[in-house]
Swiss-Prot record:
Pfam families: Cellulose_synt (PF03552). Expressed in young seedlings, primarily in the root vascular tissue. Its EC number is 2.4.1.-. This is Cellulose synthase-like protein B2. The gene is CSLB2. Signal peptide: none annotated. It is a multi-pass membrane protein. It comes from Arabidopsis thaliana (Mouse-ear cress). The active site is at 136, 461. Its main location: Golgi. It comes from the Eukaryota. InterPro entries: Cellulose_synth (IPR005150), Nucleotide-diphossugar_trans (IPR029044). PANTHER family: X-BOX TRANSCRIPTION FACTOR-RELATED.
């Protein structure tokens, strides 16, 4: 409970950033884009179909820049003051922490364990925390790893709090070199903790290779004869905190759950798992706030829970309207700078409107909001209004919305009325929790429709976020230093493509479902610029113009026709390209990144736009035609590994270190066909200029191709440089012959068409 005294300093402040210079640059680039479009229109008749195609592509790029400028116009973020929490709040609220995982092969259990351990060790009373791990793969290995981790947690959690460690994920902490006086108490504790962690790693690794090492425990009988897509509900209380006083030696609750799955029932992927987590946690601990963290995103800031509570516990009108607190999704991999930079600027921009978008991890939710509550149904003090009490708490309304479980309905009423949750014995709730995990429990209810995480999209985070903002809620954005959560991304190649395809498919799905920001035009509670922001992050459909624009310079060189204006008007194009390059480079350098990182990022987004995003459009078309159903593809996760030494103290080795670090791995997947085709076409066009393969004449008055088109071809090849290297590399870093053959056939066809058309 919080002290409402107004004389005390606030728990947080909202910081707005205004840069009139950047706004001027954004508008200047937008003006240059419109000038180029106007020039295209005025001289369209003289240049024919090529300029029409270029005009359509550039119109799309201009629209995207307009959306981006509108989104970034008023950046903001929230700065919490967790040090003030103790003097303002004498009884901190409980928090339920969710860690979903789906595949023990693609999401290694030791990585899940590290995420769980980092959450258990945060600076927050242990009796106020509960960690729930949802295993959609129903893997006995995941349960075994979690059980072994609970034993190590009794060593790790006190060690972290005793020495106030900054990094509380063991695998990251022990990657750092040991620095302490030999023989000191810290040195002895460090060595002992290191040895125990190595034992944990070996147990998990050995059990991964030999299932017999999982043991013959009666608890594992529940996993017999189970399949990932066909099994009953399994709920195990791995560790129950019975101390109840929250001292530094206590370990929070740890609960393993795996919902029932049957082949003939939809399980709605991650969104379905999150809703099951909400129901089970509601029955067991019913904390007023919920944190969801992906299994590869560990807590990197020990005060992260306290920082979020600063937002929720500030007694103000704004506090009552804050639905969730989002921390940015950041990564420890060097190959993810391209994502971090975009999210830094776009995240702060959206935060300055109605609040950040839920990105699916590192997000603290209010349970009442996830249960469908709207701001209009609250009094100024945060309690339910009389009208809401009659409508929401009616027995018929509760059963039709939340299901027929009486225990579930009771927990919902307590959550909506903000009643304190007593310390219950977790095992007493297992039977009721298993009931709400049945495949058909959500049938004829509002779960996934207006309650919990919303269905009908693979991007359940964005879908749910739009639903929350459409009800009039706001959200808060906190970007602490160091980052609150850190994770890993696929190192490159196929896995990165798969992940980007899933994200793109989900974001496009949102445009065509009931939560579409386009439909939000009829919802006054979703602000106009917030709708623009959602459109901006959903605009992966620009992949088709991106692909066409990468081929236009080559076509114009081979066809001997002009793509860019001539004379003084060429200055518009040159100034536009130069300003855009310098502007994006400045964004990178302001965040401390290098020119090389900027170049890699530009290359990455061009490759993704013409491959993963392109396939996502086909996914959506097939889904809309009813010819296919989208499948949630789990990308493979990796983590740094240690070089174990005899003493347990020694240098560590990352699995991505070495001469091949940063190289793209290729295989015969269709993901690599567009990029290979683009490189071959542009190389053929450049070679064609020197060997006289160009058409000898042109039919329009706009003139023939020239230096501008040749430079554009060179730029495209540079942006697709990983594919250029792949043409000459061998092994997994070389493009397979099957892909080269397909791309070569398409490239030859393109050249023949361009020259002969």
């Amino acid at each position: 409970m919080a002290d409402s005294s107004c004389s005390l300093p606030p728990l947080y402040e909202n910081i707005s950033y205004k840069s009139y210079i950047l706004r001027a640059v954004d508008l200047t680039i937008l003006g240059l884009l419109f000038s180029l479009l106007l020039h295209r229109i005025l001289y369209m008749s003289q240049n024919g179909i090529i300029w029409l195609v270029a005009f359509l592509c550039e119109s799309c790029f201009s629209f995207v820049w307009l959306l981006s400028t509108c989104t970034k116009w008023s950046p903001a973020e929230t700065k919490p003051y967790p040090d003030r929490l103790d003097e303002r709040v004498y009884d901190l609220p409980s928090v339920d922490m969710f860690v979903p995982t789906a595949d023990p092969v693609r999401e290694p259990p030791i990585m899940v364990v590290n995420t769980v351990l980092s959450l258990l060790a945060v600076n927050y009373p242990a009796n106020k925390l509960a960690c729930y791990v949802s295993d959609d793969g129903c893997s006995p290995l995941t349960y075994f790893s979690l059980k072994e981790a609970s034993k190590f947690a009794k060593i790790w959690v006190p060690f972290c709090k005793k020495y106030n460690l900054k990094v509380r994920a063991p695998f990251r902490y022990f990657l750092n070199p040991f620095a302490a006086t030999e023989g000191s108490e810290f040195s002895r504790d460090w060595e002992m903790t290191k040895r125990e962690y190595e034992k944990l790693c070996r147990k998990v690794e050995d059990a991964t290779g030999d299932s017999h090492l999982l043991g013959t425990d009666n608890e594992l009988e529940a996993f017999s004869n189970t399949k990932p897509n066909d099994h009953s509900t399994i709920i195990k209380v791995v560790w129950e905190n019975k101390g109840g006083v929250g001292d530094e030696k206590e370990v929070p609750h740890i609960v393993y759950i795996s919902r029932e799955k049957r082949p003939n029932y939809l399980h709605h992927y991650k969104a379905g798992a999150m809703n099951f987590l909400a129901r089970v946690s509601g029955l067991m601990t019913n904390a007023p706030y919920m944190l969801n963290v992906d299994c590869d995103m560990y807590a990197n800031e020990a005060d992260v829970v306290r920082q979020a509570m600063c937002i929720f516990l500030q007694k103000s009108q704004n506090q009552n309207h804050c639905a969730f607190v989002q921390f940015p999704q950041e990564f420890y991999d060097s190959n993810t700078i391209k994502l971090t930079v975009i999210k830094s600027y776009m995240g702060r921009g959206i935060a300055g409107i109605q609040g950040p978008i839920n990105v699916g991890s590192g997000c603290f939710h209010s349970r009442r909001v996830m249960y469908g509550l709207s701001p209009d149904e609250l009094e100024d003090n945060g309690s339910l209004s009389s009208v809401a009490t009659r409508e929401l708490l009616a027995e018929d309304s509760l059963s039709s919305g939340f299901g027929n479980s009486k225990e579930m309905v009771t927990s919902v009423v307590e959550a909506l009325q903000r009643k304190p949750n007593p310390q219950n014995i977790l095992t007493n709730s297992i039977e009721a929790a298993q009931e709400v995990g049945h495949c058909d429990y959500e049938s004829q209810t509002s779960w996934g429709k207006t309650i919990g995480w919303l269905y009908d999209s693979m991007s359940e985070d964005m879908n749910t976020s739009i639903g929350i903002h459409s009800r009039g809620w706001t959200s808060s954005y906190i970007a602490p230093d160091p980052p609150a959560f850190l994770g890993s991304m696929p190192p490159g190649g196929l896995e990165a493509m798969i992940q980007q395809r899933r994200w793109a498919t989900g974001s496009i799905e949102v445009l065509f479902n009931k939560q579409s920001p386009l439909l939000g035009l009829f919802c006054r509670k979703l602000r106009f610029r917030q709708r623009v922001a959602y459109l901006c992050v959903s605009i992966c459909v620009r992949s088709i113009p991106e692909l066409i624009y990468c081929l236009l310079p080559a076509y114009c060189l081979l066809h001997n026709s002009a793509l860019f204006p001539k004379g003084l008007c060429l200055g518009i194009t040159m100034l536009l390209a130069g300003m855009h390059c310098l502007y994006t480079l400045w964004e990178f350098m302001c965040l401390g990144h290098s020119i090389q990182s900027w170049y890699v990022s530009q290359s990455f987004w061009r490759i993704v736009a013409t491959s993963s995003w392109l396939f996502s459009i086909f996914d959506i078309i097939l889904k809309l035609l009813g010819l296919s159903k989208n499948v949630f593809l789990v990308s493979k996760k990796t983590m740094p590994v240690e070089t174990m030494s005899g003493s347990g103290i020694g240098p560590s080795q990352r699995e991505d270190d070495g001469p091949n670090s940063g190289k793209t791995e290729f295989d015969g997947s269709l993901y690599f066909l567009p990029g290979t085709f683009i490189v071959l076409v542009n190389l053929a066009a450049l070679v064609g200029v020197f060997v006289g393969l160009q058409r000898s004449s042109y039919s329009h008055g706009g003139g023939g191709s020239g230096l501008g088109e040749a430079c554009a071809c060179i730029l495209v090849v540079m942006l697709f440089f990983p594919f250029l290297k792949g043409l000459f590399a061998k092994g997994k870093y070389g493009i397979p012959l099957s892909t080269l053959s397909k791309a070569g056939f398409l490239a030859v066809s393109f050249v023949v068409f361009s020259v002969g058309n």
